[in-house]
UniProtKB/Swiss-Prot annotation:
Chief location category: membrane
InterPro entries in the cross-refs: At5g14285-like, TLC-dom
Key word Membrane present: yes
Protein name per Swiss-Prot or TrEMBL: TLC domain-containing protein At5g14285
Amino acid sequence: MSINIGEISIPDLPIFFSMFLTIYLIAYFIVFRNWKPQIRPEASSCLISIFHGSPAVFLATRAVFSSSERSFASANTAAQNTVLDFSVAYFLTDLFHYIVFNPNDVLFIGHHVATLFVFLTCRFLVFHGACAILGLLILAEVTSACQNAWTLAGARKNDPESRLAVKVYDLLSPPFYAFYSIVRGVLGPLFFGKMVAFYARGGAHGVIPNWLWISWAIVVGIAITVSILWIWNLWIELFSERKANKIRVDKKIR
């Protein structure tokens, strides 16, 4: 799709990219200008994630369910392509953020490159499969708002001038971990399994090549595995910290 300005038709992707880049720069130079230099880039990344996550869930849900064809192999609709453009623009912006400020963070850079591969091939190579990709996007971003609030609080929890951040971080951690665990540890694998089974049975024969859906499956499978390991480690840290705090309290009482 494209946006018409007068007699000029501008593709969605450049407009969305300009939007996310502008939000990032405003966040870095204005919104978080008083934050420590070490955490300003991360906070700015969180802000563009906030502008992407929940809107992407809403737009993707609407794009999928407004279509009469909702097969994992059905042709992409114009609305679905717009959502793909929206997400590609976000991941491109965030990828540049990591390349500039965290070039050694190979895990996130690799994640963003792989995600862009999935979105771009669905959008511009085969023109099919958006229902599957957007379904995964919904599951990936439905936890975004909570995760970004938790991340922003975590970035400032060690700042003596921000006691509120510690309280927010401690308050959000258990429910966020539980929500994330259900979505990424249960719903995500179930949807992923359904998608792989569909393609393995030849459901997309003739429209999505085997090498491509297998590539998608590898990317998504690795992402789900890493997410599960990440949240598992956070649960371990949470229980370890609470156990240590309980021991300290018991010692004080004695």
